[in-house]
């Protein structure tokens, strides 16, 4: 009996100790299990060696990209600034464990500085930060899988095509790959064929049309090895509302002012001033565009071509306006209007331009106007000449000059019989002679002795009356010359108006074609 009892007591003690240990392990917190797991994983772990059992093995890194924000597209410096998350997964055989040994812990987060991570960088970086700067923690799983998603803000170089600016669409890319390891050491695998846009914050200036990832492998000139990379291609389209309101519409309105230059009358004297003002305004807008678009000589933006085209036409309008003003102020004393100018610009062109010159209205009989017809210029003179000549001044001179006049008459007309013809006859003769000159007909001859007109005989005129008639004739000729000059000046002004109207329609057509040419190519390319 003694021996079985002595053998049972040690067995009971062992069971009691085992139960005590099991109870203590169950009462230990979860953090203690992770602490033991950390010690288990990183005791003797070397973060500088590739996580492969054999040197010839390749580490497969699954790579994906998630974009959070398209911060900016700098056309001047040709850079695209993005806020992205780099999704990376690979397998590390040295970081495996049995979850049952560590209180069923299947995954833990560890600082990325403690483990091996692939040196994946952005190849086409534009600001010097090629790698990830914020080292977030990595997610480890019990089967050895490592998942690391660090955020990063990259400035990648992007070739900007401003042909259809501001209705342009850009193709930018981000090229990621290992900087140190070639394809025999690290190979990349595209995690997703498209960029993850689930967490994308919409931009107010650009819209992402498409974003895909593509695997590439390339042999560079520096090395004999082949290096893999995954390139993400972004197709982004500019939202043109801002530039339409602040750039395009003002440009179109200023261009339309060029048309008004040819509708402005030449007498106002502001045609050249308006042309220069429009030219300066277009120059300011062209300077604004040069501040936005990249400094390249490969292509000129569509809006720049439109502004340059308009500036050329404004310059031509200044030249044409100077010519029109020269034509407008021509006169018979400086220029003679050729026959072809009269027939072409006064007869042929106005009919095609729907221009109708108002006819010259002559004043009706019994009415007085500013200018009388040439045949009636002497009407007032005739009335003045038919007044009695026995005025006071003539009576005084008659006594002094009577003897001298009689001697001159006898010498000039020896056969003429002195007659007491009335002064009314002399006035009648002189008026008829002057009227004959004014009407273009022959002046009546001086009647000789024995010839009678009615009951009166032809008599000579006194020198004072002859001088008066010469003054009247001079005034009549001067008024007729003024009428002719005025008519020619009006013809030149009408020629200038016809030239203005020709270029008015030409500029309207050019303005419409330029507007259509501005919007049609982007529309056909599907960018509007």
UniProtKB/Swiss-Prot annotation:
Q: Which cysteines are joined by disulfide bonds?
A: 158-172, 222-223
Q: Where is this region: Disordered?
A: 390-427
Glycosylation is annotated at 54, 104
Provide the alphabetized UniProt keywords.
Cell membrane, Disulfide bond, Glycoprotein, Ion channel, Ion transport, Ligand-gated ion channel, Membrane, Receptor, Signal, Synapse, Transmembrane, Transmembrane helix, Transport
Membrane keyword on record: yes
- Subunit and interaction comment: Neuronal AChR is composed of two different types of subunits: alpha and non-alpha (beta). CHRNA2/alpha-2 subunit can be combined to CHRNB2/beta-2 or CHRNB4/beta-4 to give rise to functional receptors. Both CHRNA2:CHRNB2 and CHRNA2:CHRNB4 nAChR complexes are heteropentamers with two subtypes: LS (low agonist sensitivity) with a (CHRNA2)3:(CHRNB2/4)2 and HS (high agonist sensitivity) with a (CHRNA2)2:(CHRNB2/4)3 stoichiometries; the subtypes differ in their subunit binding interfaces which are involved in ligand binding.
- Say which family it is in: Belongs to the ligand-gated ion channel (TC 1.A.9) family. Acetylcholine receptor (TC 1.A.9.1) subfamily. Alpha-2/CHRNA2 sub-subfamily.
Name assigned to this protein: Neuronal acetylcholine receptor subunit alpha-2
Q: Provide the species name.
A: Gallus gallus
The gene it comes from is: CHRNA2
């Amino acid at each position: 009996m003694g021996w079985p009892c002595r053998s049972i007591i040690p067995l009971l003690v062992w069971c009691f100790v085992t139960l005590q240990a099991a109870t203590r392990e169950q009462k230990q917190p979860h953090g203690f299990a992770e602490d033991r797991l950390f010690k288990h994983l990183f005791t003797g772990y070397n973060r500088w060696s590739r996580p492969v059992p054999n040197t010839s093995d390749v580490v497969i890194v699954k790579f994906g990209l998630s974009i959070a924000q398209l911060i900016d597209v700098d056309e001047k410096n040709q850079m695209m600034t993005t806020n992205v998350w780099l999704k990376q997964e690979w397998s590390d055989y040295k970081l495996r464990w049995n979850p049952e040994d560590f209180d069923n812990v299947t995954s833990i987060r560890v600082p990325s500085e403690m483990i091996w991570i692939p040196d994946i960088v952005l190849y086409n970086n534009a600001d010097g930060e090629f790698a990830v700067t914020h080292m977030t923690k990595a997610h480890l799983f019990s089967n050895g899988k490592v998942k690391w998603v660090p955020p990063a803000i990259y400035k990648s170089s992007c070739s900007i095509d401003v042909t259809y600016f501001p209705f342009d669409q850009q193709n930018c890319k981000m090229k990621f790959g290992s900087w140190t390891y070639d394809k025999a050491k690290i190979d990349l695998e595209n995690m997703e064929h498209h960029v993850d846009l689930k967490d994308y914050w919409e931009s107010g200036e650009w819209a992402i049309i498409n974003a895909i990832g593509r695997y590439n492998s390339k042999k560079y000139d520096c090395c004999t090895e082949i290096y893999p990379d995954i390139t993400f291609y972004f197709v982004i389209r500019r939202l043109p509302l801002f530039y339409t309101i602040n750039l395009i519409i003002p440009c179109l309105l200023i261009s339309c002012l060029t048309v008004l230059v040819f509708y402005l009358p030449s007498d106002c004297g502001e045609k050249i001033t308006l042309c220069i003002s429009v030219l300066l305004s277009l120059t300011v807008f062209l300077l604004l565009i040069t501040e936005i678009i990249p400094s390249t000589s490969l292509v000129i933006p569509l809006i720049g071509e439109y502004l340059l085209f308009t500036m050329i036409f404004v310059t031509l309008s200044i030249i044409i306006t100077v010519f029109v003003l020269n034509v407008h102020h021509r006169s018979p004393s400086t220029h003679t209007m050729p026959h072809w100018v009269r027939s072409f610009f006064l007869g042929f062109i106005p009919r095609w331009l729907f221009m109708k010159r108002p006819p010259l209205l002559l004043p009706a009989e019994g009415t007085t106007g500013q200018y009388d017809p040439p045949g009636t210029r002497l009407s007032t003179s005739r009335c003045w000449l038919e007044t009695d000549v026995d005025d006071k001044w003539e009576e005084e001179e008659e006594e002094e000059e009577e003897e001298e006049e009689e001697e001159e008459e006898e010498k000039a007309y020896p056969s003429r019989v002195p007659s007491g013809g009335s002064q009314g006859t002399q006035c009648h003769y002189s008026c008829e002679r002057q009227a004959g000159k004014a009407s273009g007909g022959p002046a009546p001859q001086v009647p000789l002795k024995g010839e009678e007109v009615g009951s009166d005989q032809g008599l000579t005129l006194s020198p004072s009356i002859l001088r008066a008639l010469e003054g009247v004739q001079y005034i009549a000729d001067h008024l007729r010359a003024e009428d002719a000059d005025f008519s020619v000046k009006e013809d030149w002004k009408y020629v200038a108006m016809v030239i203005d109207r020709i270029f008015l329609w030409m500029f309207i057509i050019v303005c419409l074609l330029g507007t259509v040419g501005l919007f049609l190519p982007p529309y056909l390319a599907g960018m509007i």
